[in-house]
Each structure stands twice: as structure tokens, then as C-alpha cells.
A protein has these predicted regions:
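Long, low-complexity intrinsically disordered regions
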Residues: 1-266
Length: 266
């Protein structure tokens, strides 16, 4: 059986539509559009490159038109968004905490983002930091120290910045807001008081299936091998996922001019 044929323009439009880029906004943006737009994309990468404006704000502007930049920070502070390692450091819907919790519980698998030797070497100091947050409330790394320029000419940070980054990767703390472009951290059990690992934890296999679903929906049209990189999945069960979703007609095989065979999310 021959596959449905799409022109290159058709394929381009499918992808732009899935990303919310095909048509101009029909109305003025509202605060609620920020989490809705990120949910449509599944995640929004946090990039500190700042020429015209920081990258996340430009990504939203391209989809929503003009909007107050503080809305992104407000959406995080309101608990509609969260930050964690997805593609890289990303904003994502707070409801997707379940999809990445297994990563938090196995931080040693997170490569350069988590240094187990550092966390063990500074165990007592890190315990004191956790107690400080428990007693005094949310913190920034700047609350503890200021950078100084070392002999190498690079800026050197005192340990608390690395402690907080390690605790963040391990899911002990979460970013609750950005204040003057600095992350503000609080204890995860205070940010997610209704979450229970024993009751609510989703297995890595189940989470990755949902991530593949999200990736397919957010891309709109794709090659199978593109999906894993959206959330930086290492060895997802792509073949089983593809067969199941094709049988359910959630994805449809097509032939695209100049590109060959791709899949379309229905």
C-alpha cells in the first residue's frame, strides 16, 4: 500500500502548526497563555543567551506576540510551571513532575549535572544547607556568597552554588521563582506537598512512553529517531511505541517530498 504523499510545504506547515507558529495570534496574549503555550511545546529550553532578550522570552513572543516578560516568571511562581533537566534545563508544566521524578531519584545517571563525589564529600555542609532552607525558607546561591575572580582569571564560586545545583538535580529542592535572573530554591516537599513517591511515582518505562507521546504531538511530523532527543531519552522503547501508536492510529506514516518517509501525529 502506498503512503499518503505530502509536499515539503505541507510538512513544514504541520510542524509549524504543532509548535504554534503557523498563524499570527488572533488576540492579545493573557497570563494563562504562558503555561498553555509551553504545554503545547511540552517544554521550553532555558538559554541565557541575551542579545535582544533572553531566549525563552523570544520563543514565547514568536507564538504570542507582545506580552509582559514577567509573565513567564509569574507562571513559575504561581506553580503552573516547573524547571528541570528535560532537553536541557527547561520550563515545563508542573503537572509533568511525574515524568521526570525518576531522574531526580537516580541523579548519578545525570552525567555532568550531578557529581556524587562532591555531594558525599560535602555531606555535612549540604545537610546544614537543607536545614537552613527548612528553617529560614527559600534561598538563592547569592544569599551565601559572592563570586570572586581566581588566579586563573575565571570566576570562582563558593560551595553553596554547587550544593544547590546538586540538590536540584537530585530533586531535593526545586526552583520556585527567578529573582533578578537568579534561581530561588525551596525544599521539594514544600513545593509539591501532595506528592508521594510510593503512591505517585511513574516508572521510567511508563514516563518515557508519555514523553514520546508528548514529543510526537509537539513536533507534529517527525522521523522516529527525532523523538528521543526531545527529552534526551537514552534508550527508549521506540519500536514498541511506534507499533502501538500506529495500530491505534495516533501516528500515520506518510511520504514527504524530498524527505522520504515520516510520521504524522494525528
Amino acid at each position: 500500500m502506498s503512503l499518503p504523499h505530502l509536499s515539503l510545504a505541507d510538512a513544514r506547515n504541520l510542524h509549524l502548526a504543532a509548535q504554534g507558529l503557523l498563524n499570527k495570534p488572533r488576540r492579545r496574549a493573557s497570563l494563562e497563555d504562558i503555561p498553555a503555550t509551553i504545554s503545547r511545546m511540552s517544554l521550553l529550553q532555558i538559554d541565557t543567551i541575551n542579545i535582544v532578550a533572553r531566549s525563552p522570552y523570544l520563543v514565547l513572543f514568536s507564538r504570542l506576540g507582545n506580552y509582559p516578560a514577567q509573565w513567564l516568571d509569574e507562571s513559575l511562581a504561581r506553580g503552573e510551571l516547573m524547571e528541570y533537566w528535560a532537553h536541557e534545563a527547561c520550563f515545563m508544566p508542573r503537572s509533568d513532575f511525574r515524568l521526570i521524578r525518576h531522574r531526580m531519584l537516580a541523579p548519578e545517571k545525570m552525567g555532568w549535572k550531578y557529581k556524587d563525589a562532591w555531594m558525599q564529600e560535602h555531606e555535612a555542609e549540604i545537610a546544614q544547607l537543607i536545614q537552613h532552607i527548612h528553617d529560614k525558607g527559600p534561598v538563592r546561591s547569592a544569599d551565601f556568597e559572592h563570586p570572586r575572580k581566581g588566579a586563573s582569571g575565571w570566576w570562582e564560586w563558593k560551595p553553596h552554588k554547587r550544593h544547590l545545583e546538586g540538590l536540584f538535580t537530585a530533586g531535593k529542592v526545586m526552583v520556585i521563582e527567578w529573582r533578578n535572573f537568579q534561581r530561588v530554591y525551596d525544599l521539594t516537599h514544600r513545593v509539591m506537598p501532595d506528592w508521594d513517591d510510593e503512591r505517585d511515582l511513574v516508572s521510567q518505562t511508563e514516563a518515557e512512553i508519555i514523553m514520546l507521546d508528548n514529543s510526537a504531538r509537539s513536533l507534529g511530523i517527525f522521523r522516529e529517531q527525532w523523538l528521543a532527543d526531545y527529552y534526551r531519552l537514552k534508550r527508549p522503547a521506540l519500536a514498541a511505541w511506534r507499533e502501538a501508536r500506529a495500530e491505534q492510529q495516533q501516528i500515520i506514516a506518510v511520504h514527504v517530498e524530498k524527505l522520504g518517509n515520516l510520521w504524522v501525529h494525528d
